[in-house]
């Protein structure tokens, strides 16, 4: 039981510290596990921390601390190493105590009260509902879901939230794209725009409109194109050509709203609801669930955006220039000031984003975690600035960035897009490699590091595939327990002192690390640390399984080994559950 051992070691060191340096008893004592197991089970740099205050060599202080260390059955060896570290080797009996703790606590092994059940909101994915989720969204979804489960496991009251960007121009473009495909299917000759949404899903939504409403929304091409500025040559890609296409697109949207009248709302909402439902289904199938789906449009409907901008003005953080209202974001470290309300009276996306954060804080969360794509790095300063300008505590907001995942096939970078120029979808990736490989491979790197996703490795059933390797360890334990055929409850009385060979003690030490791994991963918002740990634990188990017989003739030793194996299975299951990966009983 790592926490109890660390508590006991800390108490021993505190007694020694009181004798060696009575004036420095408030010095924090840090205990870490050495990377090299030959250096013992725990190490402390306490002597090096004291060196400046005591004006002594750290090794001299370390030896003095050892001399004053009270005797304890916990420690079989304590020695000075390197520049002044103190390394501790634990008694084997204390190492194997963790096995009983794992079996007794079961699914709760590793849980902590780190968060004190404070309220934390984790907002993630939040992709525009303008098309299918792609592999980039998938990494954010896997990270957010794993982080949410991790924080819950570590004692936080977690709310998982998806911010639905259902207001603004992108939704108008989706509605227009659907209507243009509908007109196309009814023989109306209106050119489809290169800057509209191109995917087959748009055609599918248009067909649904035809099935439900026939030709109700058909309008003459001349009326649809009336007053539009026209399009530049298709091959042009300069800024002016882009501007012309955008003007043409906006003119078509304006015409659609006039020509369809109230029916524009239907077209708009049909496209939104279809894409939102598709994304929700995709995520549910991926094992990613949300407690709240928060509508951006609701911020406008309730007047919160206007109230938020007015509050910024009241606090002296806005100015008017060329008819627009600007937020003084440079005051808070941003590279330039930002428009929150244009000269035509329309609010910017930034304005609604500020209002959304005001809403988060007004809901009383103790911590707010935003999971954003790495391309939003420059957005952090202005959002933090706006929160501060509203008179709120910006330190409650934490932003975790997620880098894009790059797919590899046959050792070569795979195409990330389809023939229509759209990214490979999350659903396609899941269909190829499966949910488990997706969830685990997405968790194999720190979220803000680039991820190379090896499709061939993810599909392989070899020890090189980490998810297979860990699941296989779990399945092997299940096989051992089935062959043993006993009652798991009886393992509480197993004689764990018989687990005395180096491989068994190494596994026990690794099991004892799990609590610390959970604690550190939760503090650092780093579920990848659990993936690393599980790979190591599976490696320790496979090495033991291949070297030793589990079901030996000696009943006492057999039960002890089955107990250790069962503890490995439980710990793997607890870790994989956090990561959203299944643990099959057989493979």
Curated annotation (Swiss-Prot):
Keywords: Aminoacyl-tRNA synthetase, ATP-binding, Cytoplasm, Ligase, Nucleotide-binding, Protein biosynthesis. Its EC number is 6.1.1.19. A motif ('HIGH' region) lies at residues 127-137. GO terms for biological process: arginyl-tRNA aminoacylation. Its main location: cytoplasm. NCBIfam families: argS. This is Arginine--tRNA ligase. It comes from Dechloromonas aromatica (strain RCB). The lineage of its organism: Bacteria, Pseudomonadati, Pseudomonadota, Betaproteobacteria, Rhodocyclales.
């Amino acid at each position: 039981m790592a926490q109890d051992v660390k508590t006991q070691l800390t108490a021993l060191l505190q007694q020694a510290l009181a004798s060696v340096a009575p004036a420095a008893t408030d010095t924090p004592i840090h205990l870490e596990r050495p990377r090299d197991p030959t250096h013992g089970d725990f190490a402390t740099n306490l002597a090096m921390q004291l060196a400046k205050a005591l004006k002594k060599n750290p090794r001299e202080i370390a030896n003095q601390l050892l001399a004053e260390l009270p005797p304890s059955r916990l420690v079989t060896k304590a020695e000075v190493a390197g520049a002044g570290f103190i390394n501790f080797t634990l008694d084997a009996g204390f190492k194997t105590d963790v096995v009983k703790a794992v079996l007794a606590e079961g699914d709760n092994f590793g849980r902590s009260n780190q968060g004190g059940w404070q309220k934390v909101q984790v907002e993630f994915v939040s992709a525009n509902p303008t098309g299918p989720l792609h592999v980039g969204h998938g990494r954010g979804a896997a990270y957010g879901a794993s982080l949410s489960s991790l924080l819950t496991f570590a004692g936080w009251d977690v709310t998982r939230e998806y911010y639905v960007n259902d207001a603004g121009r992108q939704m108008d473009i989706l509605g227009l794209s659907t209507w243009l495909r509908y007109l196309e299917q009814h023989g109306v000759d209106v050119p489809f725009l290169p800057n509209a949404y191109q995917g087959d899903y748009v055609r599918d939504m248009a067909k649904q409109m035809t099935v439900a409403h026939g030709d109700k929304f058909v309008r003459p091409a001349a009326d649809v194109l009336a007053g539009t500025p026209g399009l530049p040559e298709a091959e042009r890609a300069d800024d002016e050509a882009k501007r012309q296409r955008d003007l043409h697109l906006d003119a078509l949207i304006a015409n659609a709203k006039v020509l369809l009248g109230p029916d524009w709302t239907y077209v708009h909402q049909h496209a939104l609801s279809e894409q939102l439902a598709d994304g929700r289904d995709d995520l549910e199938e991926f094992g990613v669930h949300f407690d709240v789906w928060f509508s951006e449009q609701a911020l406008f409907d309730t007047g919160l955006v206007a109230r938020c901008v007015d509050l910024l003005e009241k606090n002296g953080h806005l100015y008017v220039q060329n008819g627009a209202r600007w937020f003084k974001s440079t005051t808070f470290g941003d590279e330039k000031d930002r428009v929150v309300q244009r000269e035509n009276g329309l609010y910017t996306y930034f304005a609604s984003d500020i209002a959304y954060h005001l809403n988060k804080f007004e809901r009383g969360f103790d911590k707010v975690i935003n999971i954003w794509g790495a391309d939003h790095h420059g957005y952090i300063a202005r959002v933090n600035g706006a929160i501060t300008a509203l008179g709120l505590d910006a330190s409650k907001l934490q932003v975790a960035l997620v880098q894009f995942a790059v797919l590899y096939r046959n050792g070569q970078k795979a195409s990330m897009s389809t023939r229509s120029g759209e990214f490979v979808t999350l659903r396609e990736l899941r269909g190829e490699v499966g949910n488990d490989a997706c969830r685990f491979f997405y968790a194999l790197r720190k979220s803000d590091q680039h991820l190379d996703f090896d499709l061939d490795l993810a599909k392989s059933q070899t020890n090189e595939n980490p998810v297979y390797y860990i699941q296989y360890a779990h399945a092997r334990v299940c096989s051992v327990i089935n062959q043993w055929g006993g009652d798991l409850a009886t393992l509480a009385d197993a004689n764990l002192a018989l687990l005395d060979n180096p491989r068994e003690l190494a596994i026990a030490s690794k099991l004892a690390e799990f609590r610390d791994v959970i604690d550190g991963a939760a503090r650092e918002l780093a579920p990848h640390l659990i993936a690393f740990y599980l790979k190591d634990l599976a490696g320790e188990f496979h090495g033991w399984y291949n070297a030793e017989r589990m079901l030996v003739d000696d009943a006492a030793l057999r039960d002890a080994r089955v107990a250790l194996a069962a503890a490995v299975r439980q710990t793997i299951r607890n870790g994989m559950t956090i990561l959203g990966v299944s643990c099959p009983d057989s493979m």
